[in-house]
Every structure is written in C-alpha cells, then in structure tokens.
Amino acid sequence: MKISAAFKLYEEQYIEVKNQSLRTLEMSRLAARNLVKFTGDIDIENLTLNHIYLWKKNLAINKTENTCRGYILKLRVVISFLYKINHNCLNPDLIPVPKREPSLPIFLTREEVSHMIQSGHNNRTKFIISLLYASGIRLSELIKLNRGQIIDNKFTVIGKGKKPRLCFIDERTRYYMELYLSERADNSEALVVSYENKTRMTATNIQLLVRNAAKRAGIKKHVTPHTLRHSFATNFLRNNGNLRYLSTLLGHSSLDTTAMYTHVVDNDLEQQYQRYHSI
C-alpha cells in the first residue's frame, strides 16, 4: 500500500467515523503530502526508521518544532492504525516522537484587547475581535456562524467531535454586531462576509485582520485569533472563574487541557509574591 493510500484509508476509517475536526483532517493531509514529497509515494511497508529520521531533519529546516512534532505524531498514528489491523509495516512503537517543549499560551490583557477593538478600521473588524474575545470560540467556529444565530447574547456552536456548546457574548460585542449587520446590504446567511464578494470570510482573511489590528494597536506580541481565545480563558481565571465552567465554555473534552491556563495565573501569584513580600 502506497503512503498516500495508507493516509487515505486512515482518514476514511478513523477520522470520519470518529467525527474528528477539520483541523485534524488537514494535519493528516499536510503530513502525508510532505512525507510523499520527501520520500516519493513508496509502499508504506518499505518505509524505514532511516526514512523517518531523514524526513524529520528535513522538516526542521523550515518548519516549527510543533509542526515537526505534529507531522511525526500523525505518521505514527497512521502506522499504528495499520499495525492494529495486521498490516505489514513498521512497528509504531519504534518511531520516536519529538517531545513537546512546554510553553505558556500568549494572551492579551483586557486593556490590550480594548485597544485592538478600537484600532479596528471598520465595524466588522471591531465585531470579529470582540466576538472572539468575549466568547472564546475557535476561528473555525466563528467562520461557520450565521446571521440570526446569536439570540439574547447566546448562541450554540458545533465544536470538536461534533459536540454542541453554548457560548455567550457581552454587550460590547452585541453593540458592534448590530452596527456591522445594519451596514450589510447582501443576502448571505453568513455572520461575517468578505467585502469583495459577500461570501463567508476565510480563515486567512480573519487571521490577517486580527494581526493588522494588533499592529495598529501597538501590540508587539504575535497575535492570532487563537490568542484571543487564550486571552478569554486567562482573564476568566484571573477573575476567579471556575476551571470546570471554563472547560465547558471552551469545549475541552478534558479538564487537563484547560489546566494549562492555571499556570499563567500561578505565574501572576509568584510575581505578586516577589513584588510585595519583604523579609
């Protein structure tokens, strides 16, 4: 079985059946494409540890550590899947996966978010930034939202694993939403649309919009739509929010995933201790 066919089989029999996210599917396809480009579409039975070692070295030239790790991990998952159905391939336990370097999420203060919103060059930009921060939703979830879906400052999204999740917005977000929608003259059902063709905005367009707003606000951090999700979570805990409630709001399947935000708050406590404790 060719490498490309092996990844395809994994997608069809595992990802789609398990209702995995589009992000998981995209990562699988990117890993397959990159591996085939490097090794050629050889039989996966002939894939060796040396192939993987050389591929990993090649990835490190122009990919981030997280991307390298993600690609190697995805290959290991696919081979593990084949191994379990008695396919003649490399033992997945022999494939070394680079360790994830521990890092705290980048987040913005409430003041920085407010500066970003005010730096938005139109009401659509202000609404998008405000919505991402107020609700903590993912970029992919924002793109799928439709007009009329937010009622009484509440709405439901379908998150990872096709699970519905209740989300909320604040009055500031509602204000910018109403301003933006009042300007719209198109018939698109999408909540946010491109000014050029009035179709649903793409992830790339929104990422660029957020990055430019951060630059105009004078923020030096690397800001993405996901940074606003991190900011929502961090500031929720800083205001003594309950970790389990936060996990539900974020749509995390495990409380362990949400717990990474407690480390940011722990850092706050340590800084306060160092600043105010005197011997």
Question: Over which residues does each language-model region extend?
Answer:
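Conserved catalytic core of the tyrosine transesterase superfamily
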Residues: 1-279
